């Protein structure tokens, strides 16, 4: 396919138009008085959102060169979302400001490589200063503040803070769509996996259709049990103890299942069989997790063990097990804290090494199940459109809160970027490098300016006053007052601010050093095939 090529100024100007189109659509959502953007969906109702990355991903421009510019800024939002989970609009605003200011200087004759050096130096200094001024997050109220600012909803802030308090910082918090209008929190304590009883005859509570085992023994194996003789020795030992038994196996079938059910119904012993969770290597890892949590052993041929040789010492123990048609929950496993901590450390190490998003999610789930539990926030709303928008906001708030726990918090509302302004301005540099630093200084003002504009105020007036205020004092756009941001609970996670700045600078530097842009030439529309009449008809036809 033939290509269109543009060079230097012409290339950068075309891409800048795309950058501005996308950034202008995204930046109206910034701050407490930011507006929403409506996105058309081919199926179903339109999506109304104020989430920067969601808007950025939807934008496709007709002109190929403009579209490349837009996609570069969408990449800033996307990367910030991947790293910090929030701050995508701030990242977009910063990128637009750096690209716009940088392009002015390149047009005036500045060397793009010198500008790049200055931009990188300024951002490195700003990031170091952000680390210095960040405060560790403490207590439930701080977590609630971070979440409430991100979601623009205090109720959501309280909900997320409660969820994190109940499942711990390593716990998994997931979002589900509620069937009602209200948003609620549901916490599953202990380890839960998505496998239910092998037979409904094993239930102990017919009203709730669940089996509840108190202080049970737990047999853990990756083998299929089809012959009762295999587990008879260990079964007899459990019956002598007068305790219930939970069997976790690849499958329990045929004669073995029938014998267990008959004896359960006769009241000889209380037993529930469930299939092992997961598949392949993940199944082995999850069975090992259950064994460590319950101080049992995985009976597997890989370790030279068979079911006949299993003794009561090989079995795990737990305070309580609840088995429903779909799930099994093990509460109060008796495993030693040291072993559980060691296993958690092992999973954390794997988390750092993995590059697969799917593996990361599964490892995070395993970590949560060992560390504390799983919280589910059930999001409710009056309409489907509102539900989608609310779910996106809560997702952002959740990511924001996790980022705050990791790297601490800084003053919100763009104030922290202005707080590092003086430090960046003091960097010794000259020539194009100094110009690069000035580009970053101008960009640092932009989030505050945009928040003020979205609140219906003159942005430059707010920026100039902020430069003269003490560190930590900022403009509360929601009330129009000047307050101490940290004390007022207007905070941003340091990780979100840092990621937004670094990603914006990275793309801006690449943009300014671009000298040629190559795009596919649009295909000419081929003429439609003429009709038969135009051909004078076919011979022999009337």
Curated annotation (Swiss-Prot):
Originating gene: groEL
- UniProt xrefs under InterPro entries: Chaperonin_Cpn60_CS, Cpn60/GroEL, Cpn60/GroEL/TCP-1, GroEL-like_apical_dom_sf, GROEL-like_equatorial_sf, TCP-1-like_intermed_sf
Extract the coiled-coil ranges from the record: none
Please name the GO terms that the record assigns under molecular function.
Answer: ATP binding; ATP-dependent protein folding chaperone; isomerase activity; unfolded protein binding
The enzyme's E.C. designation = 5.6.1.7
Name of the featured protein: Chaperonin GroEL
Query: What protein family is recorded?
Result: Belongs to the chaperonin (HSP60) family.
Highest taxon of the lineage: Bacteria
Assembly and partners are described as: Forms a cylinder of 14 subunits composed of two heptameric rings stacked back-to-back. Interacts with the co-chaperonin GroES.
Localization of this protein: Cytoplasm
The record lists the organism as: Bacillus cytotoxicus (strain DSM 22905 / CIP 110041 / 391-98 / NVH 391-98)
The taxonomy runs: Bacteria, Bacillati, Bacillota, Bacilli, Bacillales
Report the catalytic activity. Answer: ATP + H2O + a folded polypeptide = ADP + phosphate + an unfolded polypeptide
């Amino acid at each position: 396919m033939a290509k269109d090529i543009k060079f230097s100024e012409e290339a950068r100007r075309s891409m800048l138009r795309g950058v501005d189109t996308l950034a202008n659509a995204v930046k109206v959502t910034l701050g407490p008085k930011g507006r929403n953007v409506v996105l058309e969906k081919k199926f179903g109702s339109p999506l109304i959102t104020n989430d920067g990355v969601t808007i950025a991903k939807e934008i496709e421009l007709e002109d190929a060169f403009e579209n490349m510019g837009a996609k570069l800024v969408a990449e800033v939002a996307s990367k910030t979302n991947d790293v910090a989970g929030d701050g995508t609009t701030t990242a977009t605003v910063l990128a637009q400001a750096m690209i716009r200011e940088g392009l002015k200087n390149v047009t005036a004759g500045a060397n793009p490589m010198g500008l790049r050096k200055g931009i990188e130096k300024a951002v490195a200094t700003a990031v170091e200063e952000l680390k210095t001024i960040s405060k560790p997050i403490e207590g439930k109220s701080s977590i609630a503040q971070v979440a409430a600012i991100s979601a623009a909803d205090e109720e959501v802030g309280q909900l997320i803070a409660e969820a994190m308090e109940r499942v711990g910082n390593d716990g998994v918090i997931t979002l589900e769509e509620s069937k009602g209008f209200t948003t609620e929190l549901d916490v599953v304590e202990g380890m839960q996996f998505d496998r239910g009883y092998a037979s409904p005859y094993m239930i102990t509570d017919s009203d709730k259709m669940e089996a509840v085992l108190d202080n049970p023994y737990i047999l853990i194996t990756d083998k299929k049990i089809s012959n009762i003789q295999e587990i008879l020795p260990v079964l007899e030992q459990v019956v002598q103890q007068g305790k219930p038994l939970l069997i976790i196996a690849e499958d329990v079938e045929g004669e073995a299942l029938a014998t267990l059910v008959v004896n359960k119904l006769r009241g000889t012993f209380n037993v529930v069989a469930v299939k092992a969770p997961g598949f392949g290597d993940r199944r082995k890892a999850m069975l090992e997790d259950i064994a460590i949590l319950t101080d049992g052993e995985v009976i597997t041929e890989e370790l030279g063990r068979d079911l006949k040789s299993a003794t009561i010492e090989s079995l795990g123990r737990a305070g309580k097990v609840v088995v429903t048609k779909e799930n099994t929950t093990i509460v109060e496993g008796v495993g030693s804290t040291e072993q559980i901590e060691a296993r958690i450390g092992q999973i954390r190490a794997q988390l750092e090494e993995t590059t697969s998003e799917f593996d990361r999610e599964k490892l995070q789930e395993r970590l949560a199940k060992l560390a504390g539990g799983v919280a589910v926030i059930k999001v409710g709303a009056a309409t489907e459109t509102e539900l989608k928008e609310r779910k996106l906001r809560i997702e952002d708030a959740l990511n924001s809160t996790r980022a705050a726990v990791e790297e601490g918090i800084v003053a919100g509302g763009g104030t922290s970027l202005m707080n590092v302004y003086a430090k960046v301005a003091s960097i010794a540099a000259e020539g194009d490098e100094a110009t690069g630093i000035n580009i970053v200084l101008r960009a640092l003002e932009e989030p505050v300016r945009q928040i003020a504009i979205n609140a219906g105020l003159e942005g430059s007036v707010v920026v100039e006053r902020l430069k003269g205020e003490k560190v930590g004092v900022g403009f509360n756009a929601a009330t129009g007052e000047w307050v101490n941001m940290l004390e007022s609970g207007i905070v941003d996670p340091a990780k979100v601010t840092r990621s937004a700045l670094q990603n914006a600078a990275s793309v801006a530097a690449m943009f300014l050093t671009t000298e040629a842009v190559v795009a596919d030439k649009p295909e000419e529309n081929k003429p439609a095939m003429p009709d038969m009449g135009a051909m004078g008809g076919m011979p022999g036809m009337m």
